[in-house]
């Protein structure tokens, strides 16, 4: 009974034995070889293929046949015919060359009159090391601790530490002179908006004038804006005037006051496009062709009658 566990242990060790491995770097040449156990039989053919289903070559006598886009420039077969060892050399290794390579022997007995062929195969694993593996190992072996983030709002900002201060855009200060009682507010903005559409283009130019408000003069400057819209039917120009006093109130008060339009005028100008001229030209050409056709038909009928009349008079 003790022999059975020993036998099972030996079988498990045999099947657990990994394939022979060959480790190379990218760009190097790798030589793979395997020996056959049956040295008495006659080798009919040897083969190399890469798992799972890629045939590299078949060798019979001095003939070597390559498959699956493999060539002798990439893989050279260095084994003499009917040798105990079969060898291939893979040149200029790439990452795609890594994998399990299998060599196979097809043998027959010289004294056997039957066509029985024995088969032996052996596997070798090729490992291609890339330069990126060491870099990945260094990155993975480093610290994976990420800095903690807080969503709490700080109570104050220390201006002495420049690295922790954010640049905040603030409006220009308003100058208030107590003696003169003069408030000066200056607005400067240029806005050009262009809108492109299938029917045409729209362009808006707005340039508000500076506003100066004094207690003594209380001068208010109106803002005039022109809007030009070009469409397929024509060009529409709109002129609007806005009282800047509302803008002054909006700046000084917390409540927002909408802008007021004092007056507006609209002018429409018709415009002809190339399509209209094409239609007119087509209609004119059609009329001319119709007139020519009518003339030709009339001429043909009259000429035919004239010939018929002359023929009858001759008879």
Swiss-Prot record:
Segments on the Virion surface face: 17-279
Q: From the UniProt annotation, give the residues forming the signal peptide.
A: 1-16
Q: Name one Pfam family in it.
A: V-set
User: Where does the sequence pass through the membrane?
Assistant: 280-303
Disulfide-linked positions: 34-103
Instruction: Write out the topological domains of type Intravirion.
Output: 304-315
Record bears the keyword Disulfide bond: yes
Q: Does the keyword Nucleotide-binding apply?
A: no
Q: Where in the cell is it found?
A: Virion membrane; Host membrane
At the top level of its lineage, which domain of life is listed? Viruses
| PTM notes | Glycosylated; contains phosphate and sulfate-substituted glycans. O-glycosylation is required for hemagglutination and hemadsorption activities of infected cell membranes.
InterPro entries linked to this entry: Ig-like_dom (IPR007110), Ig-like_dom_sf (IPR036179), Ig-like_fold (IPR013783), Ig_sub (IPR003599), Ig_V-set (IPR013106)
Q: Which residues are glycosylated?
A: 37, 69, 112, 161, 254
Note down the stretches annotated as region Disordered: 194-213
Q: How does it sit in the membrane?
A: Single-pass type I membrane protein
Q: Name the keywords, alphabetized.
A: Disulfide bond, Early protein, Glycoprotein, Hemagglutinin, Host membrane, Immunoglobulin domain, Late protein, Membrane, Signal, Transmembrane, Transmembrane helix, Viral envelope protein, Virion
- The segment(s) forming the Ig-like V-type domain are 17-121
The UniProt similarity line reads: Belongs to the orthopoxvirus OPG185 family.
Q: What does this protein do?
A: Prevents cell to cell fusion by interacting with and directing the viral OPG040 protein on the host plasma membrane. The OPG185-OPG040 complex associates with components of the entry fusion complex (EFC) presumably to avoid superinfection and syncytium formation. Via its interaction with C3/VCP protein, protects the infected cell and probably also the extracellular enveloped virus from complement attack.
Q: What is this protein called?
A: Protein OPG185
